[in-house]
Amino acid sequence: MRDRVAMMLRPLVRGWIPRAVLLLTVAFSFGCNRNHNGQLPQSSGEPVAVAKEPVKGFVLVRAYPDQHDGELALALEFSQPLAATQEFDTLVRLEQGSGNHDGGWSLSDDAKTLRYPYVEADKHYTVLISGDLLAATGSRLGKSRKEPVYTGELDPVVGFASRGSILPARGSRGVPVVSVNVPEVDVEFMRVREKALPAFLARYHKAGQRSSWELSNQGNSRKRLSELADPVYVTRFVLDGKKNERALTYLPIQNIRELREPGLYFAVMKPTGSFSDAFETAFFSVSNIGLHARAYKDKLFVHTASLRSGNPYKQVDLLVLDAKGETVLQGATDDNGNALLNYTLNAGHVLVSRNGRDISILPFNQPALDLSEFAVAGRENPWFDVFAWSGRDLYRPGEMLRISALLRDRDGKPVKPQPVFLRLKQPDGKTFRETRLQPAEQGYLEFTQKIPSDAPTGRWRVEFRTDPASKEAVQGLAVRVEEFLPERMKLELSSAQPVLRAKAPFTLTADAAYLYGAPAAGNRFTANLAVAVEQHPLDNMPGWFFGDATLQLPRGAKETIDITLGADGHLVHDIVLPEEAKPVSPMAVVVSGSVYESGGRPVTRSLKRVLWPADALVGVRPLFDVASGADANGMARFELTRVGVDGKPQSAKGLKATLVRELRDYHWRYSDGRWDYDFTRRFENKETRTVDISSSHTTTLSLPVEWGDYWLEVFDPVTGLTMRYPFRAGWSWGDDNRGLDARPDKVKLALDKTSYRAGDTLKVTITPPHPGKGLLLVESDKPLYVQAIDANPSTTLEIPVTADWERHDVYVTALVFRGGSASNNTTPARAVGEAYVPMQRKERRVAVGLVVPKQVRPAQSLPVTVSVPELAGKQAHVTISAVDAGILNITGFPVPDAAAHFFAQRRLSVDAYDIYGRVIESFEGGTGRLKFGGDMALPPLPQAKRPTARSQTVDLFSGAVKLDAKGNAHIQLPVPDFNGALRVSALVYSDTRYGQRDAETVVRAPILAEASMPRVMAPGDRSTVTVDVQNFTGKQGKFAVKVEGVGPLVVAEAGRSVTLGIDGKTTLNFPLRALEGNSVAQVRVRVEGNGSKAERHYDLPVRAVWPQGLRTQAHVLNVLAPIAFDPALAKGLMPDSVNARLSVSTLAPIPFASVLQGVFEYPYGCAEQTASKGYAALWLDDATIRSLGIQGVTPAQRLERLEGALGRLASLQTTNGHFSMWGGNSDVNPVLTPYIAGFLLDAKDAGFAVSDAVLQKALNRLSEDLLSGAHLFYGNDQSEALMFAHQAWSGYVLARVNRAPLGTLRTLYDNERGKAVSGLSLVHLGVALSLQGDRKRGEAAIEAGFAKSEGGRPEVFGDYGSVIRDNALMIALVRAHGLAKPAYEARVMALGRDLQARRRSGWLWLSTQEQVALAQLGRALLVDQKKQVSGTLYVGKQREDIAASRLIGRSFDAAALARGVRFVPQGDVPLYASFEVAGIPRQAPVSDDSQLLVVRRWYTVDGKPWTPGPLKEGQALIVRVSVTSKQNMPDALLTDLLPAGLEIENFNLGETRQWADVTVDGIALSERADAADIKHEEFRDDRYVAMLQLTGGRTANLFYLVRAVTPGSYNVPPSLVEDMYRPALRGTGRVAPAMVTVVQP
């Protein structure tokens, strides 16, 4: 009988029955077809029409039981949506009065269905529905009704109740199974082969539901289950449980003889009679061995303990298996259950412990124990250390970065002098510069680097290494590069309330003052208040969630204060919390306060307090990865606790924990010209349990979940509050290596001292969560001390402190083990305690005296005196920094502290693993009965070109100064013309001792004159210069104030006279107007009186709000005749913006000069653009600059640009030799690598220092691509053509250095040339063949290339090319390598005619690739040109005789054009002349949406559309720019200039918490990164810039925040989007409104 049943079960479990049924069905079908017609009857039958009366009005459609996955609810469906504000519990009741629950009836998302979950199965209910029930339309139901509903039976369900894999051998009742209405289950057991353990555990980490496909699939190089495990037993169990009740039953596997052999078993279970493809699975080993392992650098400490008693388990055999199942290490534990093995951790290995029939298995691919609740964080502890510091951590582009550092060992002691290698990394993680530093006296290092003016903004990093090849940096320092203005004021917000209570006001205290020492008397102060659900109200409980995360609160901040400060700048104000802040959940209440300068620019600070709705709150800690979610078809596990405001646990009785599932009903809708889907939500209560919590322990809750979205609700009857925690199950169903079940219980450790030294005795008091045997360890990167302990509450133990503790990564660790017993439902467990052991280093910190004046005047020396008596007579140094406090306050930069760094706590360098988190739990439940059984079974984006103002930043540094014999130093620092406060900080160091001190000095002139104005202006803007004048001369007086504009600025009412008393202050407003111009203007302020004067100069850029245009004329001179510049070319352009150029050449009119200068000044910097700018710098030598008449390019600029390009390309190179477009995670396009490698070769040939490592890596990459033929362009529509182009260009570059294999080039020509779609690729291949010696094939390929180019080329196929780029490069290449022919030369004229035609259109857009190709062609043409041109140039009456040259070029401004420009040529005709005028039009360009639709919209801070009107000073707006492209555009660039009176809120610097929850058209600002594919974005002084990828037909949404700052009326610029490599593809947005006005409040 047993064998027969076993044979019946096997096909069921393995999924054979469905296949068998299918085969029988097919067989019968074929059998019927033997007689073609057989006895086939005639078609008959008439449809029966079922009359369906339409539902009219508001009525009850049906009342029914709604059951899903074993959970019941009564459901009432109505014909129309219900009014949601009704009291459903009053209007709808159960006739059984005792069954009614307050808040029981819930309304579905579509508002048509009411659900009531508090019902039982197999029971009759009567629902009483009041006739007063209202529809959303206002209709009444009209008549009360009684509706009977029978709930019926619950659906059958069964599953393993534990995710554990260790079944205690003693005192266990078996494997727990939870079931509903399942009387019997069939279970198959398989034993995993020992050599297959690593492979099995790599695939099956956890119990859960699996399909037959998962159990038998061999995909992804995985073995089938049958190859890992052998079937050993199959049986049927009878389960406990009453009908319609959830039951827990233990499967008594310990009684089965076939499962007694030591090993790991895999169990597969299904309900008897079920034909589903889903199986419940679990794996386990039966053991009494509790296994705990601690991994050090090269050691593994193992402790084995009895799972029954917690006592040490001695003489346990240990072995480590590698991924193939081979034994790599053997050992055994001693009589104390301990073993120390020489072993380095490997995640693919498995530790097996065995003693007799007991076996426990520990895979190292599981997470280490989670010790996040212990203070074990810190940096690593290598053999040497570097303390790096700077005067500040915030810099502007273009400033000098200065870094100091000290080289020491891990304890701050000297090391042998040796070079240190420094890397400066950009925000994208790429290296900008790498250099070697040699320590000076006492290990001092210093590094300086000018930050390029076009540097990418963001967080830069300085890293230090002793080995330049090391991937990991030992130490580093982060600095921020942003466009900022130093603050002029300081603001402190505080509150005496540690937490807030409902209905009580929030008492805010604000103190504001100017940094130069005066209170903010009469200044405006505003405050906004925002509330949000606070799920983490206690900082000391990370990972715990409180409150109701589903609570809907108003988004955005509301203004609560707008007042003028008193004479002392002090304010105390009670803020009434909004009505929405009801005491139903903890809430974060964030006040953002701003004090305003007289000119309107705010200084903002934030203060947060938490509103507690009750004295105690219930919290939940998910025992799974919060980001990934719980496992689908498994158990979602949680810990529950209840804590007070002080964070101390409190007990709780009768908590109601409910698992709620969110269901979504999807439906399609047609909108915006396409189909999309939407959904309505409804919720089902899956399970409700009553939970008690003690004050000393948390409670664990395990709930079965499927795939989908859930809430865990916990109702506290004492407070009446409900905690709701939403989570998802099955989000990362394929990731089994996750989960927080490794989080241990906590042992409290208390040390008797704050620090120790060798020779001391450390006393530690242990308070375990449960008594038990355990271990006390002292650890660093190895075990220093181990002792067995009996842990009881308040156990105190002593440990001797030895010399090897003298380091900063020493921890005391306590392990306490608890035995388990089924009789009292106790599961074996371990608890962990960690305490850092600080070493005594007080004697190595020295006291520093720092004397500075309390106040100094600008433009004088600041005397600094440092005294360190403890270092008298010893060698020591000091560095002094004096930095504007207005810079330091922006980021809260702390005073550098070397002692705090060197003696800081290092992280715990131990990873611990054990099996206790996977012990199968003991629950209350019955035992299953065996029915039968058997033995067989189953970018940076540098700033756009613009006039750039200089911003004064004060950062003074002394360098390393030696202390004299008395330990003193006297230093003078030159203070610039500046009013404010300097934080003066001293850092003192000797060989082993350190100290620091800081003080503040006010810098203030006798007459203080500070002006505020916009950061930028546009022609036609009207604004205000606000001047604060304060009298610090010590006597009353009359003061003359004069303000004037230099450049395109006009200041009205420029002269004033004021009388001020002692310390008196006044604020004057001067109207300011910007004229036409495109330059850096100045505002100059002069104040005189009482024998003193103050002069201040402020740069103020004036720039247009739209881009420049290009106008050209071209002439072919067939006779020698004078030519003149037509002044009409500059008509309608702003004179200051005009840049005109005359070019006369004996060659075809190639715009050699303009393209060279254009690409040299190109503002952006991806890999391609960087190489292109490098080419321009390379070719702009002195002779070329003189010949072309190019202005504004000095040799120093050329060298800086070239070296910058080489450095940036090095930072963009990836590990495989290709180049990242923008760095970081941006795309790598292999097509660019040969172009960049060619530039590196050209720069090297020209004598510049090119990194050989970068060049060789690039050449090696090209060689691999050429030889392997590996396909690199999958997904491209013309991938084969692109691959051919890439290989051909690679071959050409390699052939230049004789590294292109001739055989490979021949094969490419013979077999692949038909794939070419551009002539350039064939020319590249032809030149490469010729250089490598096969001139015949080479010339044939070149000829074929020129022939193909006559037919054009695809507009886009991924090579950044165009007809102009390809033709220019082809001609330049054959000329450069002596392969030119007359037919090829004729292409020059055709190219010139094409460019002339473009010029005549009025706009000549050229990509950087086209500009470089034209420049290269121009150079090639000039090399062999014999003809020359000379002549006389007249500018007005001024005459210049120009010597003969192949090309003559001169540049002019608008004034020269107005005087008249005429050239009289001499030479052989024909000659070619071109006139070009670039400038900014006076009239705004017409919006253009032919290729790109660009729409800018403005919103208020609560996410509502802004109605245009005057903006109050300080008012903030959200800007949304929507971009829709008609075609794919992977390299789009958005430039959104700001109106002058508005300033952008830099999300990298400002407080963003108050904006995080704001939603604009359904998009939360906290999720704005998902609204567009942004590769890089920057917040600049006057613009928002983003590089993004656009998909044809889809809309990208970009957001940023602006604030109205300076009163005035300002032009609104249009938004501009362009394709960086196809400049003709661009879109200009409409401007609405055309002007923005900012007014004072």
UniProtKB/Swiss-Prot annotation:
Q: Recite the UniProt keywords alphabetically.
A: Cell membrane, Lipoprotein, Membrane, Palmitate, Protease inhibitor, Signal, Thioester bond
Asked if Cell membrane is a keyword of the record, the answer is yes
Q: InterPro entries attached here?
A: A2M_bMG2, A2M_N_BRD, A2MG_MG1, A2MG_proteobact, Alpha_2_Macroglob_MG3, Bact_A2M_MG5, Bact_A2M_MG6, Bact_MG10
Gene3D superfamilies, A to Z:
1.50.10.20, 2.60.40.1930
- Please explain the role this protein plays, according to its UniProt record: Protects the bacterial cell from host peptidases.
Q: Where is the lipid attached (S-diacylglycerol cysteine)?
A: 32
Q: What is the lineage of its organism?
A: Bacteria, Pseudomonadati, Pseudomonadota, Gammaproteobacteria, Lysobacterales
The membrane topology of this protein is:
Lipid-anchor
- Its signal peptide is 1-31
Where does the record place it? Cell membrane
Q: Name any one Pfam family assigned in the record.
A: MG2
Q: Where is this cross-link: Isoglutamyl cysteine thioester (Cys-Gln)?
A: 1166-1169
Highest taxon listed in the record's lineage: Bacteria
Q: What is its main location?
A: membrane
Please state which protein family the record places this protein in.
Belongs to the protease inhibitor I39 (alpha-2-macroglobulin) family. Bacterial alpha-2-macroglobulin subfamily.
PANTHER family named among the record's database cross-references = ALPHA-2-MACROGLOBULIN HOMOLOG, UBIQUITIN DOMAIN-CONTAINING PROTEIN
Q: Where is the lipid attached (N-palmitoyl cysteine)?
A: 32
Under Gene Ontology molecular function, one entry of this record is:
endopeptidase inhibitor activity
**Mind telling me what this protein is named?**
Alpha-2-macroglobulin
Instruction: Mention any one GO cellular component term assigned to this protein in its UniProt record.
Output: plasma membrane
